[in-house]
């Protein structure tokens, strides 16, 4: 299934890379099941008025200002959370019960793509998991210029009956498979309500590690990476991080962004009513990550729109020592049909279709591809790249397509060069960014 964005950023960030671009930073995340089902459907022993509790939750979101917050069961009291929260970027609700998924994200950073995906399998064996279109969300979050993280929020099937276990494992594998298709080569965060425990051996929660190369923050920091075999249930609010809950966070970096978890905590004591009562039947979890840019590969911001299939040259480039572009080939006419680069070692990266007229430039041994101008526009109500112009270190250029009034120039940092691509394509180039490597 090809996702279509509900939110679009045509050209991320600055028009050109520069020496002042941020190269390191921190990210704090929070996952919280906010118990937002209608009161008649939810007897979870959370005292107090749900409207008041939801306003309190939103005020705590604003107070502690986590960078990325994934919420689950954000159904019929969603507006009250947003009423008191102050994060600048927030997903629009998909609706209350039975229309919505209950999944939303609040963030200090904008995103260039967002998609809601329904579970392919659900079960009512021990609950009403099929009552709403539960599933997961995907967004491509822009943290800084050339720094992107794919963020997944999820709420899997609950219960321990045979049908529940089958559905939940299907849910987990559905997300893992989606990551393998739509997040190839990218840094990834997955956090939310997994309804899974390592000590429940029928739960295949290890799929994110085995299939996607991700790490569980709690397992890494609180259990020294050792999968527990003895169940340790958490109180609510929890007084220890050693116990295991179903709310989890997974992460990985990529060839551009080094990502490392430095902190994990059950935030229960920060999310209490004024009388000390809990606000939800789940312990909220938080984690902190440090990030830094790689010294061997970096990327530009994106230009274009959220259509077509995802591609990335990063995995192939990560295994190369000092890659260099030797031949540039673009195809275009009314729009940009394809982009290709041949490296000095003979590797060829080609993306897009076969239409248009080809334009080729062969670089000298000491000549580098240092800048690329992209222009975009609308075709069939979809944003695509219409034009590319490459400029080398000697000032030579090659171009294809038709220029528009909406353009951005992506310039490699000083001492770096363009050696590959990442983005989305079909018969044409819908979205495009460039991979940089040292000269």
Where are these regions (language model features)?
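Metal-dependent phosphoester-hydrolase catalytic domains
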Residues: 180-188, 196-296
């Amino acid at each position: 299934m090809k996702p279509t964005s509900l939110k679009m950023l045509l050209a991320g960030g600055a028009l050109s890379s520069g020496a002042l671009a941020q190269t390191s930073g921190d990210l704090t995340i929070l996952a919280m099941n906010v118990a937002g089902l209608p009161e008649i459907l939810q007897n979870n022993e959370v005292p107090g008025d749900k409207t008041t509790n939801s306003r309190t939750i939103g005020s705590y979101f604003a107070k502690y200002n986590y960078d990325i917050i994934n919420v689950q069961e954000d159904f019929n009291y969603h507006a009250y959370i947003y009423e008191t929260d102050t994060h600048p970027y927030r997903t629009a609700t998909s609706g209350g019960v039975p229309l919505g998924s209950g999944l939303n994200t609040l963030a200090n950073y904008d995103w260039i793509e967002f998609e809601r995906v329904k579970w392919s399998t659900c079960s009512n064996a021990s609950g009403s998991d099929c009552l709403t279109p539960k599933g997961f969300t995907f967004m491509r979050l822009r943290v800084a210029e050339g720094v992107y993280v794919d963020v997944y929020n999820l709420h899997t099937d609950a219960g321990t009956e045979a049908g529940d276990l089958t559905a939940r494992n299907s849910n987990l594998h559905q997300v893992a498979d989606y990551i393998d298709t739509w997040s190839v080569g990218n840094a990834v965060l997955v956090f939310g309500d997994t309804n899974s425990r390592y000590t429940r051996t029928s739960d295949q929660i290890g799929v994110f590690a085995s299939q996607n190369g991700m790490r569980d923050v709690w397992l890494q920091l609180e259990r020294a990476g050792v999968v527990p075999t003895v169940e340790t249930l958490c109180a609510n609010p929890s007084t220890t991080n050693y116990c295991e809950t179903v709310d989890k966070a997974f992460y990985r970096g990529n060839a551009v962004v080094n990502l490392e978890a430095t902190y994990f905590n059950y935030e229960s004591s920060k999310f209490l009513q004024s009388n000390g009562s809990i606000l939800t039947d789940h312990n909220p979890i938080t984690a902190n990550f440090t990030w830094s840019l790689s010294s061997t590969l970096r990327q530009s911001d994106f230009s274009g729109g959220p259509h077509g299939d995802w591609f990335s040259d990063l995995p192939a480039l990560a295994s190369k020592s000092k890659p260099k572009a030797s031949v540039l080939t673009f195809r275009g006419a009314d729009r940009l049909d394809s982009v290709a680069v041949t490296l000095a070692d003979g590797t060829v990266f080609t993306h897009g279709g076969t239409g248009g007229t080809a334009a080729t430039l062969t670089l000298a041994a000491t000549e580098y591809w240092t800048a690329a101008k992209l222009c975009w526009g609308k075709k069939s109500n979809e944003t695509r790249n219409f034009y590319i112009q490459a400029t080398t270190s000697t000032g030579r250029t090659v171009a294809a397509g038709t220029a528009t009034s909406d353009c951005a120039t992506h310039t490699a940092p000083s001492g770096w060069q363009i050696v590959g691509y990442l983005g989305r394509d079909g018969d044409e180039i819908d979205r495009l960014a460039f991979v940089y490597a040292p000269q």
